[in-house]
UniProtKB/Swiss-Prot annotation:
Secreted effector that acts as an elicitor of hypersensitive response (HR) specifically on plants carrying defense protein R4, through its interaction with this protein. Residues 118-141 are annotated as: W1 motif. GO terms for cellular component: extracellular region; host cell cytoplasm; host cell nucleolus; host cytoskeleton. This is RxLR effector protein Avr4. Residues 224-247 are annotated as: W3 motif.
Length: 290
């Protein structure tokens, strides 16, 4: 308890000094927080776009209107609090200066919401070591972050509207503190970014994708992708080939290879009947003739 008190004092002092420093010297002022999540009803657009949001993984700590703790510093603080076994409500109230009795929709507007959400996930992973953290749930099916990304990419390739995904992920329950909305909000934000990026994509057909030996034209890329799709090369492998692995949703959406990834996902889906037919033919060929 004494260790927690000392950490609280140090943190409060650090945040206050950083805030004063940023206010006193404009040259050292940190960037303002990118507009936080608004009430999810504002994102109801039937195939439309949404304003850019801060990335779901980039938790920071804010005091007033200044970011006073970057991603790395925030992670370090949260790890220290986790090691001390600090309760979630204590982190929320004492370290993140967030009200305790609020709906998810109201809390999501607070600049420290992502830091709170990150700490909650860190707590779960510590208590459930070795288990995969559920990132998205649709109906009775649960998805890890990797599998959720693949499913969301499929929906983008199929041009599934933001409104439809909003409904499937039950985000309307955010204001009622439903478990589904609380779990799925990151996946919804990820889809919103990708759908928006897909609707605005423009690529040079002569330098359509960069992989392997360098840039390839759209025609060459399509030829290679069709071969891979026919062979059943998994989407995860192509994400790695296009150097899109280990990137946030925003980084992927802004990457020059994102249009190519969506092209492959579409081809992968389109070629599934042919892969299934080939698999059936190979199975029949292996059966002994009676």
């Amino acid at each position: 308890m004494r260790s927690l008190h000392i950490l609280l004092v140090i943190t409060a002092s650090l945040l206050a000094s950083l805030a004063v420093s940023a206010e006193a010297d404009p040259s050292t002022r940190t960037a303002n927080v990118v507009e936080n999540n608004k009430d999810k009803s504002r994102f109801l657009r039937d195939g439309g776009t949404t304003e850019a949001q801060t990335d779901e993984e980039r938790a920071t700590i804010t005091l007033g209107d200044k970011v006073v703790s970057d991603k790395a510093a925030t992670k370090d603080l949260l790890e220290r609090l986790l090691a001390l076994g600090t309760p979630l409500k204590t982190v929320q109230k004492e370290f993140l200066n967030m009200p305790l009795i609020k709906t998810f929709a109201e809390l999501s507007k607070h600049p420290n919401w992502r830091a709170l959400d990150k700490y909650e996930r860190m707590q779960w992973q510590k208590l459930n070591e070795g288990q995969t953290l559920t990132y998205m749930r649709v109906g009775d099916r649960s998805y890890s972050k990797e599998k959720a990304q693949e499913q969301l990419l499929r929906w983008v390739a199929q041009k599934k509207t933001v409104k439809s995904v909003y409904d499937d992920l039950q985000i309307e329950g955010f204001a009622r503190n439903t478990d589904a909305a609380r779990l799925n909000w990151r996946a919804y934000n990820m889809y919103d970014k990708w759908f928006t990026a897909a609707s605005q994509m423009q690529r040079n057909p002569q330098q359509y994708a960069k992989f392997g030996t360098g840039y390839h034209s759209e025609q060459k890329t399509t030829e290679v992708f069709e071969k891979w799709a026919m062979e059943g090369t998994h989407i995860k492998s192509v994400i790695k080939t296009l150097n899109l692995n280990n990137k946030s949703a925003s980084e992927m959406a802004n990457n020059e290879n994102f249009p190519a990834l969506l092209k492959y996902v579409k081809l992968y889906l389109d070629f599934k009947p042919f892969r299934d037919l080939n698999a059936k033919s190979r199975l029949q060929a292996r059966r002994p003739i009676s």
